[in-house]
Structure formats: C-alpha cells, structure tokens
C-alpha cells in the first residue's frame, strides 16, 4: 500500500525498488511524528519536540564512507581521502539491501538540495525510520506541495539502519556503510541510526558536482546584515567550532548554519534547516537555538531527559557530547526566507585550538587565507565522530575533509579566484582554548568571540592597531573595545610563558609537516606565507 503525495510516474517501483510493505510518500510533520510514535522510535517532548536516541552510533563514521570507482570518476576523486568500492561490490550491496527491505514499511521524502534553482538538485530520501524522514525534511529544502506531483529525483539516498553490510562480500570496512555511486545516482547508508549521515551524504554529493559549474561548495555557516544581503559573511569550520552558534546572531540575518555554495551570483544555502549541538546550550548566550528545543517537530537527538517531565538536561553528556537538535530554518526568527546572500564581504575561518596557542582573532592576507583553508587546522570535538572522547588536534583540509570527494586544490583554487574577484576580507577565529592547553586552560569566552566578530563584520576592526604574530605571521589586533587586552595575546594568558613557547613551536612544526603535501600544487605567494 502507498499513501501520500507523489509523482505517479516516479514511485519507488518505477526506480526498480519493489516488494516493500507500506510506502509513505512526503508525509508532513504531524503524520511523521504520529508514525514514529506508533513505531516506538522515540518520545514526544515538551512543545511537541521529538526525542530520540541513536544507539551505539552517536556521531559520523567517516571511515565507513565509500565512493564507487568507475571510469567516469576515477580521475576526479581524491582517493587518498575517499575509500574506493568496486561497482560489483556496490551492486551486491544494493541487491542485498533491497532484499533486506522486502516487506518492510518505508518513508520517502522528495526534497531539494540548494536554494539557488540554477544549481539545485532533486533528492529522493528513502528511510526505514519515520524520524529520519522528519529529520531530512527539516534539513533539506521542501518543494511546494503541488510541485511534488511532477517531482523526479536527480539522486536517491536509501537509509536502512537495520541492514548490516558484509565487508568480505561488499568490499567495505565494517558492517556500517555509506556508499556513493555517481554513475547510478544512488547513495546507500546502512548499519547506523545517526541522522547526520543523511545530510552529509547530500553535502558530499554537492561537493562533487558543483565545482564543475564554477561553484565553490563550503562547509560553512553564513549570514548577512539586516536589509543588506550584499554584506554577507561566511564562517568555515569543522563540527563543534561554532558555525551554528556564531552565525545565529540576532543583529544579522541567518542564511544557513552548515553548508553553502558560492557562485557567480552570490552565496546560497544548500539546506532548509539547522543541526545544532546542544551540549551546555545556554538560553542567555544562544536564545534562538535554545528556543527551538521546545518547538513542534524539532528532533532532539541523544539528549538525556526527565522521564516524567520530559525536561531536557543540557549538561548530561552520558549518551554523547554530540547531542543535537534539528529544526527547520524558519524556527530562527531572523532567518532568510530565500536563503540567498551576496558575495562574502568577510570570510571567517573558525578553529578550535586545543593547544591554547592561537589568538582569538587574526586578519589574513588572501595568500594566508588559502594556506589556512588548505591546512584546515582545528580539533575534533568530543562526540562528533565515532571514538572521539576529548579534543584531538587535527588538520582537516577545506575545514571539511570527510565531505570533500575532490582534491583539496580544486576547492582551494576556487576560493582563491573568488576572493581575488570579490575582495573579501579574511579572518582566523579561535574558539578553542586560552590560558593553557585543553585540560589546563579554559574555552574562549563566547562573549569575547562575539564582540570580535561584531567588530570584524561592521568594519571597525580594520581600524584597530595590529601586531605581527611572531609564530604564524598574521596580524593580530592589539586592543578591541569590550575585549580584555590580555586575551588578544595568547602568550600573556599562560602562567608559564616558557611552556607557551614550547607549545607554539610544536604547533608551528605540525603546520609545516602537514602542509608539505600541498606544496607541489600551490602558487608562490602561498608558499611564501607557509608557516615553519
């Protein structure tokens, strides 16, 4: 039996997916919550939020992500970073997954990736879990109901958490699998209930497709000045560095919190919702995000709550530090309806420095911006990936290596060209540790970070006095109104300044060692600013 609204010429049967139980097409939020409750997938929370846990997988599994190696993509995929799967292995995986799905009920959402119709793709999401359908309905963009009657997908994603892959048969690394086949326009996800795999699979897809159209795909959040979309800012950063928090600024219009494209027309959100970390979420520091946790249909993932009152515990990380909430963009009162912006006037590269060495903000030249973009230094924050329990310093090129199917210089050259053409000012912002490394120092105060960003975005910071950083060569402001001067000089925040010097030298060497891999592919001006 099928129910819901769907193109009668584009049902699952028309795609060769047959023998399922009930298929529910394009259910809206109330029906999806009703189905999820009936199936025992979660609990109804305050305000109508939906509370779920995801079992042993509470973060992404980047090592289980595979790209099918066919002739059409063999020369364009970055194989050092993307595990290959044979076409035969994928075909066997597909057949076995469909056999596993026989007789079971499935939920289908027909959605769009990309707010700019010139560059958007149609995505069909087929999920075993009703709440996954609700999640992706929030996170991607929803077509008008009447448009569903003629919807045809460019790509299809099938997510079946109860299916376990066979590494020997399918050519994957474990029972968990995310397999992308660009020739068959198909993505298969199995063996994990973590909802973030759904959205990141579509992000990876766009990251492969858009560079061929001259569009720079970015792992970033974005906002613009009220009434002035030309004054757009983008915030690059890995999970947990502050993209969602810092872009949700009551004084600016939110374009999106995680995935964007930069075309010749400007900036556009790939998504239609947000996926925010909720650990230690504070109603005073982050009122907009906090308010979404008690709104109807918000998905609350892996949060401890009181069984009787359903009150959420924002400080209990016993399930995971990677607790999250997913909600549609319109739940943020100052969100952009169009999800479009101008060419970035300011580019902020967020890093979470667990060494406690980097300043809270630094101004970058275009060459330095290219260097730091390719380096992608940050710390993996606890819980965001399987097995990460405390901050781990890492270099993740383009501030999103797990989602970049092409070689880093493809994205780096796009960024270089667009900065040169549109004259963006670039900043490096450290949201990590100050006064010492992780375990000794403390996290950078969010009020200080917000004050520095406000000064950068309104242009006043450009008028400040700057000093040249002796370790990294970038410009650091000496004083900024509303920010303690000592905070701007990391060495002064350490009790033992000799220990700081050793730590800084260690980080400089890490930068130098990591960047060796990019030297053959970069211009002389970037080589000239290389650290170490």
Curated annotation (Swiss-Prot):
The protein's required cofactors: Mn(2+)
BP-aspect Gene Ontology terms: gluconeogenesis
Residues involved in substrate binding: 60, 194, 200, 324
InterPro entries in alphabetical order: PEP_carboxykinase_ATP, PEP_carboxykinase_C, PEP_carboxykinase_N
Alphabetical list of SUPFAM superfamilies matching this protein: PEP carboxykinase N-terminal domain, PEP carboxykinase-like
Main location: cytoplasm
Binding site for ATP: 200, 219, 237-245, 286, 324, 449
E.C. number(s) listed in UniProt: 4.1.1.49
GO molecular function: ATP binding; metal ion binding; phosphoenolpyruvate carboxykinase (ATP) activity
Pathway the protein takes part in: Carbohydrate biosynthesis; gluconeogenesis
Subcellular location: Cytoplasm
Purpose of the protein: Involved in the gluconeogenesis. Catalyzes the conversion of oxaloacetate (OAA) to phosphoenolpyruvate (PEP) through direct phosphoryl transfer between the nucleoside triphosphate and OAA.
Stated name of the protein: Phosphoenolpyruvate carboxykinase (ATP)
Gene name, Swiss-Prot/TrEMBL: pckA
